[in-house]
Each structure stands twice: as C-alpha cells, then as structure tokens.
C-alpha cells in the first residue's frame, strides 16, 4: 500500500478504542470482531473460534461437553468469555479455574498462563480464544491438542469473523484496506496458519485438521 508502518501498543482495557483509534494514535486496530459496535470495521480477513486445549497424553479426546469423562476434570476459562457459559450449561463450572479477562497485557498474559498450566498438569484443559491458544501452543512447541468449540443452540456463539477497526470518518481508508485484504488473502491465510491460528470455513469446519 506504500504507506509507512508504525506499531502502537496499548492494553486492551476499558477505553481502548477511545485512547487509540479515537485519539488519533493509530489508524487501524487489528483483530477486532467484524461489526464491532464501537468502531467501523473492514471486511473480515479470517474466521475463527474459541477452542478447548488439553494434553495429547490426557487419555481422552474431546467430542462434546456431554462426555461423562469430563465431569471430574479441572477446566481453565477466561472470566466473562463465551465458553464459560458452556461450562455452566453442562455442570462443569464447579471445578473451573478462572483467569482474568481485563489485564494490562504489557505485564500479564492470562491466556499464556493458562496454556502453561495445562502443559504443567495444573489443570486438565482450558477454554480460550483460538488465535491466542494456537499461538502459544505453536510458539512453545507444547504437546497440546487444540480443538475448535462448536456453538450450541441458545448459547453464546463460539465462532467470529475477524476484521480490522477504522475510524468512521475514514471511508476511503477502509476501502483501501478492504482492497489490500482481498488482494493478499492467500498470503494472510498462510501467515495465520504459520502462527497456529485455527481457521474455519463458513460451515464452521476447520480448514486445517
């Protein structure tokens, strides 16, 4: 696109959009849910979901939350995220370990902590955002299984289209980004795959199994 790139880091806490995009400190917010209500978004550049992560030597494979083998297990879950609803629905919250949702990510990473707790057998499995889980498992070369969580009827959805956030006052910029995303779709997909991000097709099936 022939424009200079500068990265701006800011913890994703209350006031994130106001203090970054709204304050003119950046022109693009990566990795936001398409159709976000607090900013305009580009066309989606990938489709992903929450996942369940567990050790490959655990002696069980996840199929669904009705599996009676899950009852005694200790699950990790980021507080306030959609998978917590699934644990409640299936009576699995009693042994759950909550991890903080809103933290200063410059100093803390609850998702990375959860992944390490699974690897260290401090908990049996974790439910967390797929791109974070996939990245930490891949970069840490950990022997963990990452499985996409299916959405259930009358429950919060697990899968989301991911886009980039822009200011509402910059429609031409949004169109330029959309054109670039379309042109470089295959390269973007290859990078996401390399980083371990679980990708789905429009039928919610994994693109890479």
Predicted region positions:
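Extracytoplasmic
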Residues: 2, 16, 23-24, 47-49, ...
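Extracytoplasmic small-molecule ligand-binding "clamshell" domains
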Residues: 1-32, 36-38, 104-108, 194-195
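Periplasmic-binding protein-like
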Residues: 47-57, 138-181, 198-209
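Flexible hinge/capping segments at coil-to-helix
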Residues: 55-75, 89-90, 94
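Solvent-exposed coil/turn segments that connect beta secondary-structure elements
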Residues: 33-35, 47, 55-58, 80-81, ...
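A ligand-binding cleft/hinge motif common to bilobed small-molecule-binding domains
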Residues: 14-16, 22, 30-40, 89, ...
């Amino acid at each position: 696109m022939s424009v200079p790139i500068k990265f701006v880091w800011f913890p994703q806490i209350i006031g994130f959009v106001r203090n970054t995009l709204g304050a003119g400190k950046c022109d693009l917010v990566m990795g936001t849910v398409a159709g976000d209500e607090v900013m305009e978004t580009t066309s989606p550049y990938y489709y992903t979901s929450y996942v369940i992560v567990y050790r490959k030597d655990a002696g069980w494979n996840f199929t669904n939350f009705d599996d009676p083998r899950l009852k005694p297990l200790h699950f990790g879950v980021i507080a306030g995220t959609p998978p917590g609803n699934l644990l409640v629905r299936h009576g699995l919250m009693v042994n759950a370990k909550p991890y903080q949702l809103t933290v200063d990510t410059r100093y803390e990473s609850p998702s990375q902590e959860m992944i390490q707790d699974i690897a260290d057998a401090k908990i049996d499995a974790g439910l967390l955002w797929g791109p974070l889980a996939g990245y930490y498992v891949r970069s840490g070369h950990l022997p963990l299984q990452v499985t996409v969580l299916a959405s259930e009827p009358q429950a919060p959805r697990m899968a989301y289209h991911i886009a980039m956030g822009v200011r509402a006052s910059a429609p031409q910029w949004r169109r330029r980004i959309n054109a670039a995303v379309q042109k470089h779709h295959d390269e973007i997909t290859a990078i996401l795959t390399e980083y371990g991000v679980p990708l789905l097709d429009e039928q919610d099936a994994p693109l890479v199994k």
